[in-house]
Regions:
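Substrate-binding cleft/loops of secretory-pathway carbohydrate-active enzymes
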Residues: 27-64, 68, 132-142, 187-197
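Catalytic-core region of carbohydrate-active enzymes that cleave or remodel glycosidic bonds
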Residues: 55-56, 100-129, 139-174
Length: 226
């Protein structure tokens, strides 16, 4: 059973059961590498296989509607080779780096995928996203820096700028639904992923930014308000 077959069969089943107009079929890819999406959408080995009953067709032609990526910002700051430099940063320096480098890096990925989605007539969505400040090892100093940054009011400002790029860095207008990872989770050595640190927490800089973003009108085709 090929990857294309495991893609095409569920698509056809869901559309038959629920109705084609109610199903959006999404292909996941790596945010930093458009090749992963382009290759999966084309499936050249399957397309050109002489034993393929659908020879000449691409994976995209089996019913793909959208590409999904996880355009996190700041993942490189947790790389082992970056640890000595980042560990020595103050919060001011870390936020300056996020603003000048980390968010623009993510915006560049969005821009490249916006072009790819536009060229292929597809939508672009986010299956995950947000900050990615997590160390590669048990480094207490690095962990404390990243946790403090996630609690700092300036992280809300970073999120405002980041979420604005989800639409602003896509001149072709392909971007749509953005999913943040995640809702509530304790911060620590394995990351500070939650918009909140626990379910009962009233708010946080990240949560407030995400709430503001969620209240803005949606702009993509087929979206519903209310």
């Amino acid at each position: 059973v090929t990857g294309v077959q495991t893609c095409a069969l569920p698509i056809s089943v869901w559309r038959e059961v629920l109705g084609a107009g109610r199903v959006v079929c999404v292909l996941g890819a790596q945010a930093a590498n458009t090749f992963t999406a382009d290759e999966a959408l084309t499936c050249p080995l399957w397309r050109d296989d002489p034993d393929n009953p659908r020879r000449g067709q691409t994976c995209q032609q089996q019913g793909i509607d959208a590409i999904a990526i996880a355009p996190y910002f700041g993942s490189y700051l947790g790389d082992p080779e970056q640890a000595p430099r980042v560990r020595a940063m103050s919060l001011d320096q870390l936020f300056a780096e996020i603003s000048s480098t980390a968010i623009p890096e993510s915006a560049g990925w969005i821009r490249e995928y916006d072009q790819l989605a536009h060229d292929r007539g597809l939508a672009l969505v986010s299956y995950e996203g947000g900050q990615h400040l997590v160390g590669a090892s048990n480094d207490d100093a690095l962990t404390q820096l990243f946790v403090s940054a996630n609690r700092d009011p300036r992280m809300g400002q970073m999120y405002d700028a980041y979420l604005a790029q989800w639409r602003g860095a896509a001149p072709h207008g392909t971007t749509g639904l953005f999913n943040h990872f995640n809702y509530a989770e304790r911060y620590g050595v394995f990351g500070s992923w939650g918009a909140l640190e626990y379910v009962e927490q009233a708010t946080s800089p990240k949560y407030a930014s995400l709430t503001r973003y969620a209240q803005t009108p949606c702009w993509w085709a087929g979206c519903a308000v209310g």
